[in-house]
Amino acid sequence: VGIWGWSGGGSNTLNALFRKPSDYHVGIAVVPKPQPHLYNAWFQEIYMGTRESNEAGYQQSAPINFAEGLKGKLLIVTGSGETNTHIQIIEGLVDRLIGLGKKFDYMVYPNRNHGLSEGAGTLVHVRMLIARYLLENLPPGPR
C-alpha cells in the first residue's frame, strides 16, 4: 500500500510509514510537519493547546519520534524557501533518518514556499515526481 500527502497530510504519511510499516510500504511526504512543536505555534495551539499543557499530545503526534519504524520507501519533498514548515524542521527529520541509517529520498525545490508553486513548471515537476515515485516503487498488479 502506498500513501502520500501534503502539509498535514505529509505528516500523516510519515506517521503511517513509521508506525504501521507492515501496512504502508511507500510514502511521499510533501512539506510535512515532522516536529509539531517547532511549527507555527498559533496554528498548532488552536488544535492541540500549548506544548506545556499537552506535552504527551505533542510527543505522540510528532513523526520524528517514530522514525526508527521506517522500513518502506520514503520520499520527502520541500522547498528551501518554505515559510510555513521551515526547512530546518524537515532537516531535523532528515538528520534523524540519516542517524538511524534509514534509506530515503529527498527533493528540495530551490526558493519554493509551502505550495511549491513558484517558478515555471514547478507544480508539474512535483506532480510528475510523485507519479514516477509511486510507479517505480509501487507497481500495479499482483505480487
Which residues make up each language-model segment?
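Active-site-proximal cap/loop segments of hydrolase catalytic domains
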Residues: V1-R143
